[in-house]
Amino acid sequence: MDFEEFEEKDGVRFSWNCIPSTRIEASRTVVPISALYTPLKEKPNLPVLQYEPIACRPPCRAVLNSFCQVDLRARAWVCPFCLSRNQLPPQYRDITPENLPHELRPECTTVEYVLSRPAPNPIFLFVVDTCLDAENLTALKDHLVATLSLIPENALVGLITFGAMAQVHEIGYRECGKSFVFRGNRDYTAKQVQEQLGLNQPIGHRVPQQGGHPQAQGAAARFLLPLQNAEFALTNVLEGLQKDPWPVAADRRPIRCTGVALGIALGLLETSFPNCGARVMLFAGGAPTEGPGMIVGPELKEPIRSHHEIEKDTAKHSKAATKFYEGLAKRATTHGQAVDIFAGCYDQIGMHEMRSLPNSTGGALVLCDAFSTSIFKSSLTKMFARDANNFLQMGFNATFDVVPSKELKVSGLIGHAVSMNKKNPSVADTEIGIGQTSSWKMCSITPAHTYATFFEVAQQQGTPAGQIPPGYVQFLTHYHHSSTQQRLRVTTVAKALVPGGDPHIASSFDQEAAAVLMTRIAIFKSETEDGNDIMRWTDKMLIRLCQKFADYRKDDASSFRLAHNFSLYPQFMFHLRRSQFLQVFNNSPDETAFYRHCLNRENLNNSLIMIQPTLLSYSLEQEQPVPVLLDSVSIKPDHILLLDTFFHILIFHGETIANWRNQGYQEKEEYANFAELLQAPRMEVQDLLVDRFPLPRFIDTDAGGSQARFLLSKLNPSNTHQSDSGYGTPGSAVVLTDDVSLQTFMSHLQKLSVAASS
């Protein structure tokens, strides 16, 4: 089975599919033993079991799976993780080799259980900025009203608006519009929110009812109601929203208390619905300028912080704001509340400081120029996408456990989660990412959320080759399904352990998974380390990997060869070095936070597109589009290029193609093939947009156009103003840059890898 089949079957891709059997040998592989796992990956044939799982005795708690040894006569099973012998329950008495339950069938390495405990209905609390211009506010209101039709009728909904003040709208009050106003320059605790809203009476809806529905009665029912009871009132409030009345002078920014509004939203939820899956959805059209969490003062003469100021620690408000939002993130994760941030303006809204909110809770980040754009509208609509059974494709209040067999230990996780501080003997001393635990919490989880898990080989001493058992890993994901069921997704995988030096180790290397996993480590390091240090670390790891696994003679660069399953890895690292994930120049702190958030969320395929974008070429000589090198030599006057960077989709018309189009050849009947050529990349774009979240920015440009820079910045500059004609081909573009080319990069890599003193 190849790597893609493993991913299709279980949503798992390992960096190494054969693992060295000792810790010292495993450390020599350079790339850690690690895996990318998509817990809720959509599978059309996924067994959904309507009974409780059978778990091993404590402290193991691994779930019965197809790798267990089952003694049908004794009605017992042996756990492959701790080797304990367990009795099968009475309901398994009729099983035979021909009639096995799904969890014991070899092909069912991933199953999902529907648990008997009900889950509460989901909660959606909108937090809306009213300091917007009339056009932007109208577009936002209209689309929020349209979005109500996408939310399940039994979901609870609420609304908070903010400008200079924050207002909690009492949508349960029928007589007229009513709201509770909070000052925008003050930090409110959850207790103060509770008292001011009158929520300090005993509330009976903290525990789900029999059917799994939280009782929306008592004081909280004034603010959070089932959509079927509140849609009319909420629609009226949204349609009646007006621009914040606080006056704004020409030389000042609007007074915007974003931090206070978010704090009140979390306070309302944690006092009324603790540990119930909820989404706080923030729609912001500018920077917070008031109260806790402000990132810039109201005077326009004070510029918004840049990367340079943040690095030099001269950004006036950034550190305090970051600390404030980290405190909110901790509160949100404690009670299972996800925070989504939608930015609808050209300016920054403080995503850099707020990044801990979506990063810790699994919320979404969407960055667009205005709420009237298709990027915002399509992205918000896709958030509420339904599955084949018409349920929302999102889970709430999830926990994620990794159970390894005794041969492996868990080093950590990188993804949108927080530690549950569950320390046990399977936790490694080495920490990568969020470590020192084998259990994490995800307040929100979707079929797109992918997590990087890292492992350490436990054994210090080697074992004779024929006696090494395989290593097992079980991933357990408990979550609240949007149907108000609690579910458990179980994936169990086995990997061969082999002695150090075994050729199977090198042949089992998955260069695509390794590139994404190493990128996640680099991004995790970037939160605390200097950018140049991370670049040096990336280069050092690449050189060490090549020294270990390349075929070469010492001090002879011309003899350097990489096996086919290593050959693309240096190329991935070259494009990573040039990417917006590590190179923050020309990006705002908000943009950098957005890009890194998306990479830490997406699956392997989408992550690779972010690291090394794809480029397709269309021409009259080719019936089908052809993948071409991400290189300046691919730009030709009689070709159309389609670039997909995940964040941007760009159609680039060569000079000749653009001239023909401008002369209107596509409108003439005898040039129907040219009209089809112009249309072909647009049809491909439509296919790309179907599953993409958030919606990418679409760019249509020509050779010499100002927006062609988006393409040129991603291409390998093999033909520059400084290079001689040895590189490139006649008619290819010249890129004006001082960046080194892939050819130069590979030449230096080969020299350093074969050097005896390295």
From Swiss-Prot:
Localized where? Cytoplasm; Cytoplasmic vesicle, COPII-coated vesicle membrane; Endoplasmic reticulum membrane; Golgi apparatus membrane
Q: Which UniProt keywords apply?
A: Cytoplasm, Cytoplasmic vesicle, Endoplasmic reticulum, ER-Golgi transport, Golgi apparatus, Membrane, Metal-binding, Protein transport, Transport, Zinc
Q: How does it sit in the membrane?
A: Peripheral membrane protein
Q: Which Pfam families match?
A: Gelsolin, Sec23_BS, Sec23_helical, Sec23_trunk, zf-Sec23_Sec24
Keyword Cell wall biogenesis/degradation assigned: no
- Tell me how this protein assembles: The COPII coat is composed of at least 5 proteins: the SEC23/24 complex, the SEC13/31 complex, and the protein SAR1.
Gene Ontology CC terms: COPII vesicle coat; endoplasmic reticulum exit site; endoplasmic reticulum membrane; Golgi membrane
List the protein's name.
Protein transport protein SEC23
Per UniProt, what is the name of the gene that codes for the protein in this document? SEC23
Q: Which organism is it from?
A: Yarrowia lipolytica (strain CLIB 122 / E 150) (Yeast)
Q: What does this protein do?
A: Component of the coat protein complex II (COPII) which promotes the formation of transport vesicles from the endoplasmic reticulum (ER). The coat has two main functions, the physical deformation of the endoplasmic reticulum membrane into vesicles and the selection of cargo molecules.
Similarity comment text for this entry: Belongs to the SEC23/SEC24 family. SEC23 subfamily.
Q: What's the domain of life for this entry?
A: Eukaryota
